[in-house]
């Protein structure tokens, strides 16, 4: 890793400096604070996961060791809602379908959670989903709909609408408080 960092500092940053050492995180699992899960219908059911290597085929993954355990609970809840309400997954090849991605963020210090649904239009019976999610965890502070109608593999569009709760979640990093939206890096 040290060599990779040094090479990238030189090649990409134009900096001729040496990284002294890489300090590993003591937390090997559950350290990610953001996940973007593409949607797909697999065996007749809504599933979220990650793209298989070098493809846009979704490999279902309810629980990823890099994400906190509660992300899996949110994934399962949204899958159940979609199956119970006939919500279709967007298909990049045909341009048809409603739900494109499930996007989850959390603030590590604040404990606040943002759930963002990326869809091509309005989600039917979304009030039911809001009740399911907010009944599941009091840490969910924001549920947002991002409408992305474009024929693109870019996940988010500029059109975000808060369905429930706050527009952003907050977190503290290095003593500074940040407001985090779905479109934050």
Show the residue positions of the predicted features.
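Accessory RNA-recognition modules of RNA-modification enzymes
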Residues: 1-185
């Amino acid at each position: 890793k040290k060599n990779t960092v040094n090479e990238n500092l030189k090649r990409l940053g134009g900096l001729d400096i040496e990284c002294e050492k890489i300090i590993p995180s003591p937390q090997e699992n559950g350290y990610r604070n953001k996940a973007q899960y593409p949607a797909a219908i697999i065996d007749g059911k809504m599933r979220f996961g990650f793209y298989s290597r070098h493809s846009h085929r979704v490999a279902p993954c309810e629980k990823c060791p890099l994400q906190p355990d509660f992300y899996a609970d949110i994934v399962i809840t949204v899958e159940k809602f979609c199956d119970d309400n006939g919500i279709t997954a967007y298909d990049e090849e045909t341009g048809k379908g409603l739900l494109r991605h499930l996007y989850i963020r959390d603030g590590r210090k604040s404990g606040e959670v943002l759930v963002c649904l990326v869809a091509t239009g309005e989600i039917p019976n979304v009030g039911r989903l809001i009740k399911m999610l907010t009944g599941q965890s009091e840490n969910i502070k924001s549920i947002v709909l991002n409408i992305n109608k474009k024929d693109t593999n870019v996940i988010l569009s500029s059109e975000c609408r808060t369905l429930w709760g706050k527009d952003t979640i907050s977190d503290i990093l290095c003593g500074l408080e940040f407001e985090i939206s779905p479109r934050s890096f």
